[in-house]
Amino acid sequence: MDKKLLEILACPVCKSSLIYKKADQELICKACRLAYPIRDDIPVMLEEQARQFDPEEEI
């Protein structure tokens, strides 16, 4: 994931910043508790494609 791209991306739901989780190839929004998948190095920033994650899940 390109660092500059990560700096400009925001959660499409709440506009919060995102955290890159390399091991799972996801972008995490802590505010919404959503994890957006990254497929073929392209972030899929669609709410319906995101998964809800448990607040106790390690980020």
Swiss-Prot record:
Bridged cysteine pairs (disulfide):
none
Any Pfam family hit = Trm112p
Classification via PANTHER family: PROTEIN PREY, MITOCHONDRIAL (PTHR33505:SF4), ZGC:162634 (PTHR33505)
Name of the protein in question: UPF0434 protein Noc_2677
Q: Which GO terms describe its cellular component?
A: cytosol
InterPro entries in UniProt: Trm112-like
Family note: Belongs to the UPF0434 family.
State the organism of origin.
Nitrosococcus oceani (strain ATCC 19707 / BCRC 17464 / JCM 30415 / NCIMB 11848 / C-107)
Which SUPFAM superfamilies does the UniProt entry name for this protein?
Trm112p-like
Its taxonomic path starts at: Bacteria, Pseudomonadati, Pseudomonadota, Gammaproteobacteria, Chromatiales
Gene3D superfamilies in the cross-refs: 2.20.25.10
